[in-house]
Amino acid sequence: METVSAVNQTLPISGGEPVKFTTYSAAVHKVLVMINAGILGLLQLVSQQSSVLETHKAAFLCFCVFILFYAVLRVREAMDVRLQPGLVPRLIGHGSHLFGGLAALVLVSVVSTAFSIVLFLLWFIWLSAVVYLETNKPSACPPQLPPV
């Protein structure tokens, strides 16, 4: 049996978990890209001055580094989820979500530092809950030892 994921690719169903995670992860990545693009647009509207780049040079450099890590982990996640479903590809996926969210928070901190701190706390609680629930799922069958 096969299903169609959010990016119109057929994926085999073997329990449904890889498909659910791929759909969830694709939705998170779409939201992250829209948020980062929206914040960049907001920065253009709020400050029409070139001095913003010079006063917040470290923040923009940090944003670029986070986006680079986000892109590398996103590509790695896309390759790993299709090849080998399991814990490591999911943690790589959550890591890419982490860096994409941090990139957005760095841009928000340029506009309002206090608001970005509140968002960071809420976002960290959410990410911790997702990773905790993901890593503590009971397995369907106990691990078997190899034959001696």
Curated annotation (Swiss-Prot):
Catalytic activity: Ca(2+)(in) = Ca(2+)(out); Na(+)(in) = Na(+)(out)
GO terms, biological process: calcium ion transport; defense response to fungus; monoatomic cation transport; protein complex oligomerization; response to fungus; sodium ion transport
GO cellular component: endoplasmic reticulum membrane
GO function term, MF aspect, one: sodium channel activity
Lumenal-side positions: 47-51, 111-116
Keyword Ion transport included in the entry's annotation: yes
Residue spans crossing the bilayer: 26-46, 52-72, 91-110, 117-133
Keywords: Calcium, Calcium channel, Calcium transport, Endoplasmic reticulum, Ion channel, Ion transport, Membrane, Plant defense, Signal, Transmembrane, Transmembrane helix, Transport
Chloroplast is among the record's keywords: no
Database matches in InterPro entries: Ca-permeable_cation_channel
Upregulating conditions: Accumulates in the root pericycle upon Plasmodiophora brassicae (Pb) infection to prevent pathogen colonization in the root stele.
Regions of this protein lying in the Cytoplasmic compartment: 1-25, 73-90, 134-148
Membrane topology reported for the UniProt record: Multi-pass membrane protein
Domain of life assignment: Eukaryota
Subcellular location: Endoplasmic reticulum membrane
Job of this protein: Calcium-permeable cation-selective channel conferring a broad-spectrum clubroot resistance by supporting cytosolic Ca(2+) increase in root pericycle cells. Triggers immunity toward fungal pathogens such as Plasmodiophora brassicae (Pb) and induces defenses. Also permeable to sodium ion Na(+) and possibly other cations.
PANTHER family named among the record's database cross-references: PROTEIN, PUTATIVE-RELATED (PTHR34115), RPB1A (PTHR34115:SF13)
Self-association state and partner proteins as the record states: Forms pentamers with a central pore to produce an ion channel.
Protein name: Calcium-permeable cation-selective channel WeiTsing
Taxonomy of the source species: Eukaryota, Viridiplantae, Streptophyta, Embryophyta, Tracheophyta
